[in-house]
Amino acid sequence: MNAIVEQLKSTAAATKATDLRAAFAADSERFSRFSVSLDDLLMDFSKTAVNDDILKLLVKLAEEGGVEKKREEMFSGKVINFTEDRAVLHTALRNRSNTPVLVDGKDVMPDVNAVLAAMGKFADGVRSGALKGATGKAITDVINIGIGGSDLGPVMATLALAPFHDGPRAHFVSNIDGAHIADILKLVQPETTLFIVASKTFTTVETMTNAQTARNFIAKALGEAAVQHHFAAVSTALDKVAAFGIDSARVFGFWDWVGGRYSIWSAIGLPLMIAIGPENFGKFLDGAHAVDNHFRQAPITENLPMLLGLIGFYHRNVLEYPTRAILPYDQRLSRFPAYLQQLDMESNGKGVTINGTPVEGNSGPVVWGEPGTNGQHAFYQLIHQGTSIIPAEFMIAANAFEPELRHQHQLLISNVLAQSEALMKGRSFAEAKKQLTDKGMDDKKADFIAPHRVFTGNRPSITFVYDKLTPYALGRLIALYEHRVFVEGVLFRINSFDQWGVELGKELATGLLPVVEGKESAAGHDSSTQGLVAALSKLAK
């Protein structure tokens, strides 16, 4: 594998000098040769510097890097998250074929289907009004309380599928900052509000602090006995849930082989199911399952997650591009970049290999983005003319849900196509100067101004095109990126499924709380922390 990486690196200088405009001019088939599809989902990577030779090397890299072998280990329930001694089976949650999936010799599918059925029954009860609040009124608002994977996925997907909402209004609280829950509680009435507390252990500080605030909100307005009518939980800590006052019939579990950032397919998706209904939630799972099958069965050169991961590895570890921009041209996907940020950076932001040695080269990139066209008026300047090359990944649906606003969607499409073309083509000095002189600027001034209007071009982008942002399409898109992260993680030779980097700060925060409360001295901490504690204490009222 290292030899192939070195071969790829030897092509890097030539690749960086590649004139994509010339490549398209010389090859009328470039688009068809460097794009792949899964049903209506098209992935165009022709505007990257990948050519036939590089693609062959990347395929060889996947083969010799053991990606296919590791893929089958994941799907078959092997313990690939070895630092936590866990299988990695979020794919079982959307296994619509019901083919047995074994963990320690036991088929997990009966339990998966039982939880899914219980979720559906509960969601239908809330949606229909059969499950009422303590005063007999139907639930009109559902507030999900969680953080990280218990929040980002449901928030993103619920917003993305807004056209399919026909249930109660959905709200989300994550931040321990009291302003977050305070602002949400102003929008609802206690007698018609249901809270879902999502915490596997029921000990997550942010979640349980907000849950206690929510409990006080209900108890103060409706009495202690009302709590059981206004809460549900997604957790495996039944004793703690019962102590909180939540009926066991309203508790939905999941398993230690489901990582938080991969948990939207599990009971963590309950607020989404309540919003869009069990049938549409099933279609969401169907879309992901279709990608799972494609990932396992399609040859590498036709395999969307494989190719996306290979190109991502090439950009990060060969061309050494430090970031990637996620740019969905769909306002309802406005939280998708943040969702992928956690998925990618928490998975592949590692500095140690599976052998316990330092990573050679780079691991995962910084992932960020905003929906188009908003980003065009914010940070695209740097993507087009900055000194760093930032690979861009565009997403656009051919059809929107507002036929009366068709012209606006056509404007959206024209913008995303223009951005990918502009990044590829750029604008030369001669073209910039001619544009100025054609407008009447004299030659000398045009020579001075033109450099500021030059675009180097050759800036890589991938574009995804699909029919419409349905539950099926969203499930497919999420699973595509999940498997992309997996492919890159295997090639980085890291464990993509733990997150020890989250722990140290949490441990230190626990120790600092008594200091902030004034119960202990800050003397044992560094001078900066002592100074900050003193400054905050002085300002506190």
UniProtKB/Swiss-Prot annotation:
Keyword Ligase: no
EC number: 5.3.1.9
Pathways involved: Carbohydrate biosynthesis; gluconeogenesis; Carbohydrate degradation; glycolysis; D-glyceraldehyde 3-phosphate and glycerone phosphate from D-glucose: step 2/4
Catalytic residues in the record: E346 (proton donor), H377, K506
Subcellular location: Cytoplasm
HAMAP family noted in UniProt: G6P_isomerase
Family, as annotated: Belongs to the GPI family.
Name of the featured protein: Glucose-6-phosphate isomerase
UniProt source species: Rhizobium leguminosarum bv. trifolii (strain WSM2304)
Taxonomy of the source species: Bacteria, Pseudomonadati, Pseudomonadota, Alphaproteobacteria, Hyphomicrobiales
